[in-house]
A protein has these predicted regions:
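Cell-envelope/extracellular polymer assembly enzymes that use nucleotide-activated donors
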Residues: 2-4, 32
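Short, acidic, metal-binding catalytic loop of nucleotide-sugar glycosyltransferases
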Residues: 21-30
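Short beta-strand/loop segment that forms part of the nucleotide-sugar
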Residues: 30-39, 60-62
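A conserved acidic beta->alpha catalytic loop
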Residues: 37-46, 92
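Glycine-rich, basic loop-to-helix element that forms the pyrophosphate-binding segment
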Residues: 63-80, 97
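Short aromatic/hydrophobic "clamp" motif used to bind/position activated sugar donors
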Residues: 85
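Conserved donor-nucleotide/metal-binding helix-loop-beta segment in metal-dependent transferases, i.e.
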Residues: 99-117
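Short beta-strand-to-loop element that shapes/binds the nucleotide-sugar donor at the catalytic cleft/hinge
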Residues: 112-130
Length: 134
């Protein structure tokens, strides 16, 4: 089974990068990562271009015309080729086993939902790549 991850983002490359660090450290790597971009600017585009060298990323973008997250998510779904899709946001850093657990628990015809642990903002801001790797 192939796994695709759809990450929604809007104008926050610092948070998006922290999330991408997590996808570099997966026990079971994503077959595709689609960044559903609700109209971010040049800084986000440049970050995504940098990470395309490290991860199988597709950047699905539309012009900023207000909050249209659902529209860009639908476009990302259309762009996806994976058998199984995981949806997340730019500020959700996955555990190293996040995709491996999805791979283990996925069953045809079922929807799998999970939770998250919300870190205090001060800790989230201080999070560095080595924290995610370790």
């Amino acid at each position: 089974m192939t796994i695709g991850v759809i990450i929604s983002t809007y104008n926050n490359p610092a948070w998006l990068e922290k999330t991408l660090w997590g996808y570099l450290c997966q026990d079971r790597m994503a077959d595709e990562i689609i960044i559903a971009d609700d109209g971010s600017g040049e800084e986000t585009r440049m970050l995504i271009e940098r990470y395309k060298k490290l991860l199988p990323i597709k950047h699905v973008w539309h012009e900023d015309d207000g909050f249209r997250k659902t529209v860009i998510l639908n476009k990302a779904i259309v762009a996806a080729t994976a058998d199984y899709l995981v949806f997340t946001d730019q500020d959700c850093v996955p555990r190293h086993d996040f995709l491996a657990v999805h791979n283990l628990m996925a069953k045809k015809g079922f929807f799998l939902s999970g939770g998250y642990f919300k870190l205090p903002l001060s800790i989230s801001k201080a999070l560095q790549e080595e924290d995610v790797r370790d």
